[in-house]
Each structure stands twice: as C-alpha cells, then as structure tokens.
Amino acid sequence: MPIVNRIAAFDADMKKWRRNIHQNPELGLDCYQTASFIEATLREFGISEIHTGIAQSGLVAIIDGKENGDTIGLRADIDALPMTETTNLEYASNNSGLMHACGHDGHTTMLLGAARYLSETRNFSGRVALIFQPAEENEGGGRIMVEEGVLDRFNIKNVYAIHNTPDVTLGKFYTMPGAIMAGADKFHIDVVGVGGHGAYPHETKDPIIPAIGIVHSLQTIVSRSRDPNDKLVVSVTQIHAGSTDNVTPENTYINGTVRTFDKVVQDMVIKRMEEIVAGHAQSFGVDCKLRYEKGYPPTINNPENVEMAALAAKDVSGVSMVDDNAGQEMGAEDFSYLLEKRPGAYLFLGIGEAAGLHNTNYDFNDDASVYGASFFARLVEISQPLGR
C-alpha cells in the first residue's frame, strides 16, 4: 500500500502542527513550549499515558496495541538552532536568533501524525513508545535520555528514527546496515610561547610558527597515518592569535573536528595528535596543550532492523524509492546513543527541492510529512503485527 489514506486525510492538520512548531523554536534542553504543544496534541488524540520531564523538556508517550507484545521506540528530535531565519515566510520564527533550520519541526510532525493514526487504529501488538527528544544539536539529549533510563523504564526493544534530506526526491528513503553516520569529536590545541615586541622576534617565542606547523602536520594523519580503506576527516576550523600588528602574541589557539566510524581509527587519531603536538613543542621550545573531546559516537544500524525498516519504507513509497544500501554520511547524530543500547535503524527521507540544512533559508517541505508519518505507522504494523 502507498501513503496511508487516513494519514493523508489529516495532512492539513499536520501542516498546521509543523508551522506552529516552526514559529516557536527552542534551543537545547529548554524546549518546554514545544513539549507542551506536543503533549496537548497527543491528548487530543486520546493518548493518556504521557511521561514528561525526561532530559528536562523531553517526553515519552505510550500507545497500547490490541494484543500483548514488545515495545517499539520511535524517536523525533524537537530542538532548533541558534540562527536568524531569513525565509520571510508568514510562519517564520517568532523567537529572535532561533530557527528550525534542520527540520526537527518536520520530524516532530511526522511522529505526531503516526501517533494520531496509531491511537485511532491500534492494529498492532505490544506497545509504541513515542520519544520526543530535546537537545540533539548540541547537548546530547539522546545520551541524557539513555542515562536517565528511558529504554529500560519503558522496556523498549527496538528503536527507529528519521532525518529529512533536502534536494533528494520527495518520498525517497535511504539507509544502510552498519555505521551510517560518523562519530564527531572536537579538539583544542593551545600553543603557549613568550610574547613581545614584533620588532624584536629574537626576544620572544613566537607561538604562530609552531601552530602553522601543527596545522600542516595534522593533515598527514589522513594522508599518511590512515589506512586508505578507512574513512576519516580531520578538519582545522579555527585559528586564533594576536590582536595587533606590532606585538608577537603569547598564545595561538587551534580548534577543529574529527569524524570517524570506528574506535581503532579514533584511537590512532588521538595518538598521532599527541605525538604531533609534543614534537612541535619540543622543536620550537614552546608549551603545547591538546584537549581532545569525544563527542557523539558513530550511528550504527542493526542489519535486521534495516531490513524491517526497508520493508515499511517500500510499502509506503515503492521499491524503486528505497535504497537500503546507501553510503555513509560524515555528519553525526545523537540517536547513536540509543543504538548503542538497543538494536534499531536510522533512515533518511528526501523532502524534494529545498535550501540545505543549517541554512537560514531552509524550510521543511510539508509534503514530506505524510511519507514519514506513514512510514512510522506501517513500521509498527509490520514489525509488531496482530496474531503473531
């Protein structure tokens, strides 16, 4: 069957929900207004078991099927970004300096649409746990939810999530078994020398020269220390030194990001960074300090769950519109914390022509909501059928 007819029937309502959320973006863990809207909407559907205050402003709602069985977890992120919207849409952000530039308003709407349908029909066994999670963008709300025991508390067996993708055909799903998204780490290097007058460099220990050497040497981690079969990104994204033209600064700061798909490569990167930083410190007689921060782990899909998700996606969009062996993405996602604890799958959904994610002109395509909601609904019915 294609898009669920009942879900298509309330497409106009989903559009209203999405635009309401879009107009009222919130940041990080402080998504209380968004959570209140979600809770009120769920209660309109007749869903009474709603647990709030998870990861501060997150919530989990439970829908019981017609028969006993397992609990499937469906997750949507609800937070926005600290950006100023430039779309000039009539439903543009009302909150200065905040906007839904990554489509979390759409993700939330898709899960609400599935919730409405599932609460009406309940043609499945077991239970559905609807997970509305704050702080995907920065503070790791997924990690906090796991630490607070959300998976054990609701006895969730499998977990699934969707992310929208602009400029991919509307309704096209793609995913893959194994690591689909990279782990994301940060590094900070402080090069400390001796400052002084720019006219007397011999009386200083210039931190800029060794910093330049460090930046160049970091690039060799990818080109000379990495197995060519392993994907790896080491990007220097910030260099800060000095404040005027006739003073040699005391400090130079280097910041950047590392993207990896497995721990062996990650450990190699850390070891090589430590060696490079120590070597330049000794060569130039300066003090170099490396601070490496491990961030979101890789997002690793379970093959069996990918197969199940692909069945549901093909049921909604057709076989030709589903790629279940897509390539890896170098972006990162805190749904990875849930996948470390439970088998599941993360999928991408094309939303058609649109500005890129994290762009001030981005807007989620409302036409995609019926695809995502139908996917979640059919996933529940296919994976937890009645009479199993």
Feature annotation, model-predicted:
Residues 212-388:
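Metal-dependent amide/peptide-bond hydrolase catalytic core
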Residues 31, 59-60, 81-83, 87-99, ...:
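Histidine/acidic-residue-rich, glycine-tolerant segments that coordinate divalent metal ions
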Residues 21, 61, 74, 104, ...:
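Divalent metal-coordination and catalytic microenvironments
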Residues 24, 202-209, 264-269:
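Active-site pocket-shaping loop/turn-to-helix segments
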Residues 1-100, 109, 116-124:
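Acidic/His- and Gly-rich active-site-bordering loop/insert found
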Residues 26, 77-79, 135, 165, ...:
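Active-site beta-loop-alpha junctions enriched in small/polar residues
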Residues 75, 187-189, 346-351:
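Non-cysteine beta-strand/loop elements that form the S-adenosyl-L-methionine
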